Amino acid sequence: MPVLAVIPARLGATRLPRKPLRLLGGEPIVVRVYQRVVQLGVADHCVVATDHPEVQEACARHGIPVVMTRADHPSGTDRVAEVAAQPEFSSFDVLLNVQGDEPFVSREALAGAVEIVTSGLAPIGTAAVPVSVDTLQRPDVVKVVCADDRRALYFSRAAIPFLRDASDAAVLAPLVRQHVGVYAYARQALQQWVSWPPHPLELIERLEQLRPLAHGLSIGVTTVAATEGGIDTEDDLVRANTHWDVLHAANSSAYRSA
């Protein structure tokens, strides 16, 4: 099944203003995410979807294909659906949404999400990593709990499941994961998703994936090893640049030693 990767890049983020254009290793974050997706080789083609000409111009300077979309989309998935509906992309059976703040996303996360769809486990696939007990209370960490067949039961910013007895903390490890900002969709599932208005649960939690769940559409979850997280705040950006410098210093050292 041909896979189209779409990177939604919205300039109007509140926690990190102008996020797609902030610099990571000397280049805009959106450029680094595109480079990462192409490097991993899971998708057959990759484009950036944005509603702002400054993002379009930054991508054009790097030869990155861009699709201009409407500015009023309630979520990244709605933006991806606008791209998928364009005639030039009609041959792609699977759409892969890689959020524009995930420059360190792993191949396992992308390939695992796609495999959920292509194997028929669920019409939507996503990824998650192990979560530590001390981060369960953090609302910026999105948690997911799954059924035994890897289908998501619920996503939340709250601590789920509720730990009634502190002595049971050890049993949480295999039951809860931290969500990673990646989605793969079968084309029909993507069309269904955006045909529904935002659900009250989605609006309360500010989590777009609760829309299909609330309507009975299954989301399969692949669990992968933890990697450097996404970039949502100024502190995240500092951390990401430090991580980038360490990675590239190590790569340069290995190259000189070879």
Swiss-Prot record:
<dbReference type="InterPro" id="IPR004528">
    <property type="entry name" value="KdsB"/>
</dbReference>
<dbReference type="Pfam" id="PF02348">
    <property type="entry name" value="CTP_transf_3"/>
</dbReference>
<comment type="pathway">
    <text>Nucleotide-sugar biosynthesis; CMP-3-deoxy-D-manno-octulosonate biosynthesis; CMP-3-deoxy-D-manno-octulosonate from 3-deoxy-D-manno-octulosonate and CTP: step 1/1.</text>
</comment>
<protein>
    <recommendedName>
        <fullName>3-deoxy-manno-octulosonate cytidylyltransferase</fullName>
        <ecNumber>2.7.7.38</ecNumber>
    </recommendedName>
</protein>
<keyword id="KW-0548">Nucleotidyltransferase</keyword>
<keyword id="KW-0448">Lipopolysaccharide biosynthesis</keyword>
<dbReference type="GO" id="GO:0005829">
    <property type="term" value="C:cytosol"/>
</dbReference>
<comment type="pathway">
    <text>Bacterial outer membrane biogenesis; lipopolysaccharide biosynthesis.</text>
</comment>
<dbReference type="InterPro" id="IPR003329">
    <property type="entry name" value="Cytidylyl_trans"/>
</dbReference>
<comment type="similarity">
    <text>Belongs to the KdsB family.</text>
</comment>
<dbReference type="GO" id="GO:0033468">
    <property type="term" value="P:CMP-keto-3-deoxy-D-manno-octulosonic acid biosynthetic process"/>
</dbReference>
<dbReference type="InterPro" id="IPR029044">
    <property type="entry name" value="Nucleotide-diphossugar_trans"/>
</dbReference>
<keyword id="KW-0808">Transferase</keyword>
<keyword id="KW-0963">Cytoplasm</keyword>
<dbReference type="GO" id="GO:0008690">
    <property type="term" value="F:3-deoxy-manno-octulosonate cytidylyltransferase activity"/>
</dbReference>
<dbReference type="GO" id="GO:0009103">
    <property type="term" value="P:lipopolysaccharide biosynthetic process"/>
</dbReference>
<comment type="function">
    <text>Activates KDO (a required 8-carbon sugar) for incorporation into bacterial lipopolysaccharide in Gram-negative bacteria.</text>
</comment>
